[in-house]
A protein has these predicted regions:
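Conserved nucleotide-sugar phosphate-binding/catalytic loop shared by glycosyltransferases and other
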Residues: 71-102, 325
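Donor-binding and catalytic core of enzymes assembling or modifying cell-surface/extracellular glycoconjugates
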Residues: 227-304, 308-309
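Nucleotide-activated donor-dependent transferases that construct or modify glycoconjugates
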Residues: 23-46, 217
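Leloir-type glycosyltransferase catalytic cores
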Residues: 4-21, 155-203, 319-344
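Histidine-anchored nucleotide/phosphate-binding helix
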Residues: 49-64, 236
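Conserved nucleotide-diphosphate donor binding/catalytic pocket of glycan-assembly enzymes
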Residues: 2-3, 92-189, 211-214, 218, ...
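Active-site donor-nucleotide binding/catalytic segment of nucleotide-sugar enzymes
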Residues: 37, 41-43, 187, 191-257, ...
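Nucleotide-sugar donor-binding patch of glycosyltransferase catalytic domains
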Residues: 144, 266, 294-344
Length: 344
């Protein structure tokens, strides 16, 4: 029932906002115009979607080094993710359940009118509420995130959800007179500090009690993205045989469940940054497509994303040595080969 209600809600929002917002490059920036305040809108509460904002924030930091960035989001995870981003100023947080917190929800939307921005950015072209929020905001320049057909030809990774908006934004900014730089799109980055990394190292050592490198598994995911217990058991058996010199452990989800029935050493935490510090000390992280897969990528660890139902082109991890594997097309032996290539 909840899924049906959400589907209806999205359909209504899409219809109401389909004609809202077109990015216009209304003349060139004059020489005295300085971008000091930027709004980025992503009204979503999911861990993965908020982590996928980190490359865009880094892009703004690089393009406008002295700008302050406000974020318009949903739920309470965003301040935790952006804890070490000094450029991030205000975070407007819509409640996850609007009808249970109607006053806070309305207040969140009206906060957009109480601030003036040089540039307002819709972080995801497909977000109806994102387009609506940018339309509602007070800004000199509004970027709604529309796709640019020519860019699809220029960039093989154009459809990746973290990269798409950056490519489109670079194109838009070049139209209003800013230099179009072609540097690599930033990686996801949790910006773990020294203490968090040291704490993660200690917790990992306390678990494995040796100095061998560690392979970390995350066996949970939502809905059809989740692989079965039998799949994980068969995969683990091959992994153990192929990597005898590695520790193999499991990071448990918030629900404290395991597709391996808790048969291997495991680590549990509800603290996203603690999890990130722990993962950062592992040699490689293997998971199906989910928010914790993006957390691993944002922690800097080579990440193997297992895909069977979702679009890997849009969601695959892309930091150093990370890769996605469509398990519909390869067997476990091939998966092991790809893991070896990443580790080497």
């Amino acid at each position: 029932m909840k899924k049906k209600i959400n589907a209806v809600r999205r359909s209504i929002m899409k219809s109401l906002t389909k004609n809202i917002g077109k990015s216009h490059a209304e003349g060139k920036l004059n020489q005295n115009f300085v971008v000091k305040r930027v709004l980025i809108s992503r009204p979503n509460h999911r861990l993965g979607n908020i982590l996928l904002l980190t490359p865009l924030v880094q892009e703004i930091e690089k393009t406008f080094p002295n700008a302050k960035i406000d974020l318009f989001v949903k739920g309470g995870i965003t301040p935790i993710i952006f804890k070490n981003y000094k450029s991030v100023d205000k975070i407007f947080q819509l409640p996850k359940k609007p009808f249970s917190n109607l006053f806070q929800y309305i207040k969140g939307w009206f906060s957009l009118k109480s601030n003036k921005y040089d540039l307002a950015i819709n972080a995801t072209q497909g977000s109806s509420s994102g387009r609506l929020s940018i339309s509602f905001a007070k800004a000199d320049y509004k970027f709604f995130g529309e796709d640019v057909e020519d860019l699809k030809i220029q960039h093989s990774d154009y459809n990746h959800i973290a990269k798409n908006t950056i490519y489109n934004l670079r194109n838009y900014l070049s139209q209003i007179g800013l230099e179009d730089h072609r540097s690599q799109v930033p990686f996801l980055d949790l910006r773990l500090d020294k203490e968090e990394l040291e704490d993660g190292k200690k917790k990992l050592h306390d678990l494995v009690k040796n100095d061998k490198k560690t392979i970390c598994l995350f066996t949970n995911a939502t809905g059809d993205k989740c692989y079965s217990e039998s799949w994980w058991t068969a995969f683990y058996d091959k992994l153990e045989s192929a990597f005898p010199d590695y520790n193999i452990i499991e990071l448990l989800p918030v629900e404290n469940i395991s597709k391996l029935n808790f048969n291997i050493p495991n680590f549990y935490s509800k603290d996203v940054r603690e999890m990130g510090g722990f993962i950062a000390n592992c040699a490689i992280f293997i998971a199906a497509d989910n928010g914790v897969m993006h957390l691993a990528s944002a922690s800097g660890t080579p990440t193997i994303g297992l895909f069977s139902v979702t679009n890997e082109t849009m969601y695959k991890p892309y930091n150093h040595k990370s890769l996605s594997i469509n398990t519909n097309n390869v067997d476990n032996d091939k998966v092991i080969e790809l893991i070896k290539s990443s580790l080497n």
